[in-house]
């Protein structure tokens, strides 16, 4: 991913270009006879979630994305679960430079059943799902099937998701810096 328009778009969402370039791909596609480009995020079956400022969609097949950083025993490890790739990228931005556990990006809560075998293989599941009814139901289902489940959504209330939280945090930080930079008097 090197397209400056797409990197700028992700920048408006709080995602640094180094993270975007490492985790995403650039996708060119044709729709109704016109060419477009978008940010692509690969799933485990070769499909893509695609986003640009004007479009949100997918290239089949739809599936989850499993990002494995850990080479040890999964039973002794945690896995983080995200609803969409923008929340996953937001987590990486918030934890920049720190070690990250294994992650599962559902790419839609409808894909939760596809993730359950993987989630059950970990000792702990930390959920970073949306603060809405679908997110709550997904956490409940994970809780029914997995041993230790932690719902992290309360940490970014009142925001709908981790990306909204990140964007607000950046906006607040910029506002604070602007106030500090004003002359006294």
Which residues make up each language-model segment?
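Short secondary-structure transition/capping segments
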Residues: 10, 66-72, 150-158
């Amino acid at each position: 991913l090197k397209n400056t328009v797409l990197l700028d778009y992700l920048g408006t969402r709080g995602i640094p270009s180094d993270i975007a370039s490492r985790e995403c791909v650039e996708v060119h596609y044709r729709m109704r006879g016109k060419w477009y480009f978008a940010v692509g995020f690969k799933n485990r079956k070769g499909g893509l979630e695609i986003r640009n400022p004007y479009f949100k969609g997918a290239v089949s097949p739809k599936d989850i994305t499993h990002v494995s950083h850990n080479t040890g025993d999964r039973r002794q490890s945690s896995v983080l679960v995200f609803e969409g790739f923008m929340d996953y990228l937001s987590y990486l931005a918030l934890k920049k430079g720190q070690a990250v556990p294994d992650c599962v990006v559902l790419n839609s809560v409808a894909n939760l059943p596809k993730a359950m075998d993987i989630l059950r293989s970990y000792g702990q599941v930390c959920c970073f799902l949306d603060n809405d009814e679908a997110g709550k139901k997904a956490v409940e289902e994970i809780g029914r099937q997995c041993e230790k489940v932690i719902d992290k959504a309360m940490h970014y209330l009142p925001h709908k998701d981790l990306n909204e939280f990140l964007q607000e945090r950046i906006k607040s930080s910029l506002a604070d810096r602007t106030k500090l930079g004003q002359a006294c008097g």
